[in-house]
Amino acid sequence: MNRSYSKESLSEIAGGDEDFMGVVAQTFLEEIPPDLAALQEAIDNDNKELAYQFAHKMKPNLEMFGIDVQKDVAAIENWTKSSKPNSAIEENITRLVSVLEVVFKELEEDFK
């Protein structure tokens, strides 16, 4: 079954330990949703400094799970250093949220 995250990448990091993979997945599910909400709020409020902090904080976790959103996170980070309005990254944050909502469901199914 195709997933929006890489179970192989997670398994490699966990040394194939299913229990540890479950712990890592649970930690991801506890930390990333509130960080994503805070990122969205920072973008909505045009708080570029805070948006950068949350995007940067989330990036290693997204990479660890092999979630293909690096371009969107990079676009958000680049926006924080620009004078562009938040509408310039509307597509990026929308795609990031959509992909992560799917990943959250998949992780909940895979690591009940």
Predicted regions and their residues:
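Extended low-complexity intrinsically disordered regions
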Residues: 1-5, 9-13
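Amphipathic, coiled-coil-like alpha-helical segments
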Residues: 2-4, 24, 28-30, 61-75, ...
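Short, charged, low-complexity loops and linkers
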Residues: 10-22, 52-55
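Flexible interhelical turns and helix-capping residues at alpha-helix boundaries
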Residues: 14, 18, 32, 43, ...
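An anion-binding catalytic pocket shared by soluble metabolic enzymes
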Residues: 58
